[in-house]
Amino acid sequence: MSAVLAVEAATLPVGWYWTTMGEIAEVVGGGTPRTTDPANFEIGDVPWITPADLSGYTEKYISHGARFITRKGLDSSSAQLLPAGTVLFTSRAPIGYVAIARNPLGTNQGFKSFVLKDGVLPEYVYWWLKGSKQRAEALASGTTFLELSGANAKKLPIPIAPLDEQRRIVAEIEKQFSRLDEAVANLKRVKANLKRYKAAVLKAAVDGRLVPTEAELARREGRSYENAAQLLGRVLEGRRRQAKGRYKEPDTQYTGALPALPEGWVWASAEQCCASVRDGTHDTPAYVTSGIPLVTSKNLLDDGIDFDNTKHISVADHHEVSRRSAVARGDVLFAMIGTVGNPTEVKTERPFSIKNVGLFKGDDDCLLAAYLCHWLSSPVLCAWLRPRLKGTTQKFAPLGLLRELPIALPPRSEQDRIVAEVDRQLSTVAAFERSASAEIGSAQLRRAILDEVFRLSRGSGSPRSAECS
């Protein structure tokens, strides 16, 4: 008995015992037939599982993967036909995926599978191994990636309970996981409702229904006001004077019908409303270990910029990119490729460069950056933009399209009120979304359930009394 098992043995109740997987199962590896021989795969009828088949797989049992092999492929490789009830355990890339064979099947060399002896339930071993990833990794070795050898797979510890107790433990775990899955489903419904509510808030904002319009307030108070058309005209005239005859008039031609706007609002292009509309580099500068962050579409989040997962470029390359698109606090970024959108207001002084990201430089006299962010997230703008995106396999918004984006422009003081009310309502939504996201798919909670049920089963408690908190 190993030192670990000797220490643990004292914690087990009567009838239980610590052992290893090698004592309760035959440990079987897998293999891959030669892929250059079509006879190994064509019209194969032997299910053949790889670790990729278990990536994202949430069922307990598996009957087949993406590929089948032939009997010739099975016989000519180190793959073996495993009986139904075999517990499959990935031993590399990554370690720790688990499933039970629903029917006879084979695996590639990324598995150490356990063909169990009598007296041990596959489901009991399945749940124990679901919580044994760290134990397995501690026994693994390798430089490029960790791999659990067959010899070390045999050393994996497991507490064995009497058969009836195994059945009770399995039933308790599955009851708790069923409750957890129901809770997760409810949380997903909550998130979907929050998303719809957020869209409704943004639509109400750009429909002029979220706050009293400036036109309404002016009538109520018996005063005049600067409507959006006057505001835009004043700003554009100021730019013309400043440019001294060199001002290039923005394109104001929209394609497709646009909805009617509230009194005092006007349709304008992004190029009219903003000081400038540019984009980041489309090249890929050389990456460095430590340097200036290069922000791409995937780094734009609802609540800011994800600097934790950016690549870095040299200071010299940053200066070169900044000649085209220098980012400053108060600018609005917009993903141009892949998941187009995710508008984000820059709220940091930290220097960074952008790649495949649109850059809207605000003109606070005309358009508040926070209002622009909300408008670019609105269902109205998204519906206008979606059919105009370019590309087939991967959609993208070219710079010209970003400059033409229609903006529902309210009077300037009305923008402030809209932003304040949208932020107030969406701050509550964001708090709920963060809470829901933290719970959905919580691996820690699932691990805690496994640990708690096995702990209570080995201690003075009963597994039937274990509850999710």
Predicted regions and their residues:
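A short glycine-rich beta-alpha junction/loop motif
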Residues: S2-L5, V14, S91, L105-K112, ...
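Non-catalytic DNA-recognition/assembly elements of restriction-modification systems
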Residues: S2-T32, K155, P159, L163-V170, ...
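Low-complexity, Lys/Gly-biased intrinsically disordered segments
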Residues: A3-A9, G15-K60, G73-S77, R241-K244, ...
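A short beta-sheet element
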Residues: T50-A52, A66-K130, S149, T296-S297, ...
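Short, basic/aromatic beta-hairpin or loop at an interaction surface
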Residues: S55-F68, N299-I313, K347-T348
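Interdomain signal-transducing alpha-helices
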Residues: V125, K133, Q166-I169, L372, ...
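Extended, domain-scale alpha-helical bundle/helix-rich regions
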Residues: V190, Y197-K248, G461-S465
